[in-house]
């Protein structure tokens, strides 16, 4: 296999979040991740250990999606989800902030939530929907 052929794939993130995946579909996705040398995966808490097991020695960063897609979880639940992600061996957090705070002009609460999460042990990526930000 020509390594340069898949060089761009190392910058692409695979997303495994479908709650209706069969185990066969899940394994097909993981095999494609290995085949195309995908290096980043965004997934749910439920899939972290299965992704790690299925990918074996394939070097990949597994990021957990928190508060996605609605951005409406209570802070205590978010904190527990992040702790669980850490325990399961996730490499990062992808977080959808509570934009509702901004609509109520509560920028400080919005920023405080993000600050608390950013102090955890994992790198943090914020998810923004550009179309909703206009």
Task: State the predicted function of each range.
Residues 34, 86-89:
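Non-catalytic positions within long, well-ordered alpha-helices that form the structural scaffold/packing
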Residues 18-28, 33-54, 60, 64-66, ...:
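Conserved alpha/beta-domain cores
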Residues 8-17, 39-43, 60-68, 91-95, ...:
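Hydrophobic faces of well-ordered beta-strands that scaffold small-molecule active sites
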Residues 13, 51, 85:
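Conserved, mostly hydrophobic/aromatic
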Residues 5, 102, 124-134:
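Electropositive, surface-exposed helix/loop patches at the edges of structured domains
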Residues 43-61, 72-79, 100-118, 132-134:
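Active-site-adjacent beta->alpha loops and helix N-cap segments on the catalytic face
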Residues 1-27:
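Alpha/beta catalytic cores of nucleotide-metabolism and tRNA/nucleoside-modifying enzymes
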């Amino acid at each position: 296999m020509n390594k340069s052929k898949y060089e761009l794939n190392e910058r692409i993130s695979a997303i495994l979040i479908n709650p209706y995946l069969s185990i066969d579909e899940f394994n097909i996705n993981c095999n494609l991740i290995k085949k195309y040398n995908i290096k980043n995966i965004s997934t749910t808490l439920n899939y972290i250990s299965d992704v790690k097991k299925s990918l074996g020695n394939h070097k990949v960063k597994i990021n957990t999606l928190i508060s996605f897609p609605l951005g409406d979880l209570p802070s205590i639940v978010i904190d527990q989800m992040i702790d669980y992600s850490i325990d399961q061996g996730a490499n990062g957090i992808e977080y959808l902030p509570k934009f509702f705070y901004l609509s109520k002009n509560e920028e400080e609460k919005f920023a405080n939530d993000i600050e608390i999460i950013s102090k955890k042990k994992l790198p943090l990526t914020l998810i923004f929907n550009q179309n909703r930000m206009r």
